[in-house]
């Protein structure tokens, strides 16, 4: 079910990369 749901997969990956990394990526994208 999780594999069939793109949103769940996205959240899983987000949890794997962790908050600091996600924040850095978001900050980088925001700066660009």
UniProtKB/Swiss-Prot annotation:
Q: Which InterPro entries does the UniProt record give?
A: Hsp_70_fam
Q: Name one GO molecular function term.
A: ATP-dependent protein folding chaperone
Provide the induction entry. Answer: By heat shock. Acts as an early heat shock protein, induced within, and reaches a maximum by, 5 to 15 minutes of the start of heat stress. Levels decrease over time.
Q: Which residues form a coiled coil?
A: none
What keyword terms does UniProt attach to this protein? ATP-binding, Chaperone, Nucleotide-binding, Phosphoprotein, Stress response
Here the disulfide bonds are none
Pfam families cross-referenced by the UniProt entry:
HSP70
Which family does the record claim for this protein? Answer: Belongs to the heat shock protein 70 family.
Q: What else is known?
A: On the 2D-gel the determined pI of this protein is: 4.7, its MW is: 70 kDa.
Question: What function is annotated for this protein?
Answer: Acts as a chaperone.
Q: Specify the protein name.
A: Chaperone protein DnaK
UniProt lineage: Bacteria, Bacillati, Cyanobacteriota, Cyanophyceae, Nostocales
The gene it comes from is dnaK
């Amino acid at each position: 079910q999780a594999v069939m749901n793109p949103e769940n997969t996205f959240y899983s990956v987000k949890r794997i990369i962790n908050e600091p990394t996600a924040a850095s990526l978001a900050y980088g994208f925001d700066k660009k």
